[in-house]
Every structure is written in structure tokens, then in C-alpha cells.
Amino acid sequence: MREKIKLESSAGTGHFYTTTKNKRANPEKLELKKFDPVARKHVMYKETKLK
């Protein structure tokens, strides 16, 4: 089953993306490089819990 997750910016801007992931196939935490519109550059986004 796919679960909803939050990808939070490592730039400290508070910006985040939401997405889904299959926790059984990928149990480790997700890290992606995505665009942060607040910082106006590409930064690492790390998986956190969606509340």
C-alpha cells in the first residue's frame, strides 16, 4: 500500500512537497534534489512524516 509522505526542504525555508511511496518496496527514507521556490534554487528534500 502506498503511504503519503512529506518531502521537506533542507534549506530551512519551511517549503515542502507531498507525495506517495511504497514503504514495503522502499523502507529507507527518501532524499531527492528538487527546486525550492522560496530559496530560488535546487536543494535536497528529505522525507518526514505527514501529520
UniProtKB/Swiss-Prot annotation:
Gene Ontology terms: cellular component: cytosolic large ribosomal subunit
Pfam families xrefs: Ribosomal_L33
UniProt entry keywords in alphabetical sequence: Ribonucleoprotein, Ribosomal protein
GO MF assignments: structural constituent of ribosome
Superkingdom of origin: Bacteria
Secretion signal span: none
Disulfide cross-links: none
One record GO biological process: translation
Chain intervals for the UniProt region annotation (Disordered): 1-23
Coiled coil: none
Extent of Polar residues compositional bias: 10-20
Stored Gene3D superfamilies: Ribosomal protein L33 (2.20.28.120)
InterPro entries: Ribosomal_bL33 (IPR001705), Ribosomal_bL33_CS (IPR018264), Ribosomal_bL33_sf (IPR038584), Ribosomal_zn-bd (IPR011332)
Similarity field: Belongs to the bacterial ribosomal protein bL33 family.
Name used for this protein in its record: Large ribosomal subunit protein bL33
Protein source organism: Nitrosomonas eutropha (strain DSM 101675 / C91 / Nm57)
